[in-house]
From Swiss-Prot:
GO biological process terms on file: regulation of viral transcription
Domain of life where this protein originates: Viruses
Protein name stated in the entry: Zinc finger protein B385R
Entry similarity comment: Belongs to the asfivirus B385R family.
Entry's induction text: Expressed in the late phase of the viral replicative cycle.
Zinc finger residue extent: C2H2-type: 166-190, 168-190
GO MF annotation list: zinc ion binding
Source organism per UniProt: African swine fever virus (isolate Tick/Malawi/Lil 20-1/1983) (ASFV)
InterPro entries attached to this UniProt entry: Poxvirus_VLTF3, VLTF-3_Zn_ribbon
PROSITE patterns reported in the protein's UniProt record: ZINC_FINGER_C2H2_1
Keyword annotations from UniProtKB, A to Z: Late protein, Metal-binding, Zinc, Zinc-finger
Disulfide partners: none
The keyword Zinc is assigned to this record: yes
């Protein structure tokens, strides 16, 4: 119990130190607000923990005969509540935020995803925080120019495309933006087409596909207005399985995709993992949060590199499950057969497309030190039976 309390106190001290150390810098406001979210979360968990154990502490001091019973009860609570996992999960997220901020500032850091020890994770976070402070101390001479603020009434100015600059909504002052070209296509729709945002977020695509590959998406995605729960689809698939004498335990992603094509429901190809779980009772492996975060970090870097090395003449369209397949094939050890089952739930495209993707992936790996390139092995499924 004392060990758990010490861990909570170490985490609280870490958050306080980071907040006080970075509060003076505007560029860290977003980072601090995200860290405060985790700080409030860990405080609530700590409060709940103390509320649970306090009655047992009172009983422990009431007599020697009750102490062993009380200690056993506290140990049971710690196991049931899974306190260590909650602390560790929070610290993994915090370390990811700090490491991501350092990478934005151009500072290279080592991957620190392997440990599940909360005290080591606190030490890691403290080291990352010190690197942030060192980076800031080297760039203190750099000043931030608040060019959007009106110099007369100090309110935020807005873009005025007709005047090619910023205009204050209060006093009407116009500030010309030197060296800036305004393209009307960024501000208006043409031919009834919807204007697209210029911000591309690889993390959104990663989370969408991970959710579907691991079968965590909503079961309502299988349904229609006439069949909200997707019962009809599952019944149709079961009829085909019975007709073809298929073994349910050996069903694969490709089997499900072929059956969906037969019943004209290829719109459910993204839900194959969920369908497999509903039919077989066995779902994809539950990958730990630290591995998923590491995969997200590498995925984001890979997409950025891909935009630079993309071959001319190829359609600018990514098949994101391929990237996820290659990343997890590389970061999961060969003997980790449990987690490597995730590869079974990722559909790979045809041989020609796969060869082109492998060639492109080789170029990406040359600039991605976390991944060592190797050709895609379609026979991965045989390694898990």
């Amino acid at each position: 119990m004392d060990e758990i309390i010490n861990k909570y106190q170490a985490v609280e001290k870490l958050f306080k130190e980071i907040q006080e150390g970075l509060a003076a810098y505007d560029q860290y406001k977003t980072l601090i607000s995200e860290l405060l979210h985790y700080n409030n979360h860990i405080k609530q968990e700590y409060f709940n923990f103390l509320m649970i154990i306090s009655p047992y502490l009172i009983r422990a001091h009431s007599g020697e005969t009750l102490r062993n019973k009380v200690n056993n009860e506290i140990k049971r609570l710690i196991l049931v509540e899974n306190i260590n996992t909650k602390i560790s999960k929070t610290l993994v997220s915090v370390n990811f935020l700090l490491q991501k901020k350092l990478s934005v500032d151009g500072v290279k850091t080592k991957n620190m995803w392997c440990t599940n020890n909360p005290m080591l994770q606190v030490k890691t976070a403290h080291n990352l925080f010190k690197q942030l402070c060192d980076t800031q101390s080297k760039t203190q001479w750099v000043q931030t120019l608040k060019y959007k603020e009106c110099k007369y009434c100090h309110t935020d100015m807005v873009f005025n495309t007709t005047q090619f600059g910023l205009q204050c909504p209060n006093c009407g002052c116009i500030q010309e933006l030197m060296g800036t070209i305004f393209d009307e296509t960024h501000f208006y729709n043409h031919d009834g087409q919807k204007a697209k945002s210029g911000i591309f977020n690889p993390n959104r695509h990663y989370r969408f596909w991970i959710e579907h590959i691991l079968g965590r998406n909503s079961e309502q995605e299988l349904g229609t207005k006439q069949d909200p729960c997707g019962t009809k689809v599952l019944q149709q698939l079961k009829k085909i399985i019975k007709r073809d004498n298929k073994c349910i335990a050996l069903l694969t992603v490709e089997n499900i995709r072929k059956m969906l094509k037969e019943i004209n429901r290829t719109d459910l190809n993204n839900c194959v993992s969920l369908i497999l779980r509903k039919l077989t009772g066995v779902g994809p492996p539950q990958i730990s949060e630290s591995i998923l975060l590491r995969g997200e970090y590498i995925f984001t870097e890979a997409i950025k590199i891909r935009e630079k090395v993309c071959k001319k003449g190829r359609i600018n369209r990514n098949y994101y499950p391929y990237y996820i397949y290659k990343i997890f094939d590389a970061i999961l050890p060969p003997n980790d057969t449990t987690n490597r089952r995730i590869l079974q739930y990722i559909h790979l495209q045809g041989n020609d497309t796969l060869a082109n993707n492998d060639s492109e992936w080789e170029s990406i790996c040359m600039e991605l030190p976390e991944i060592k390139w190797k050709p895609t092995d379609r026979t991965h499924c045989v390694h898990f039976f």
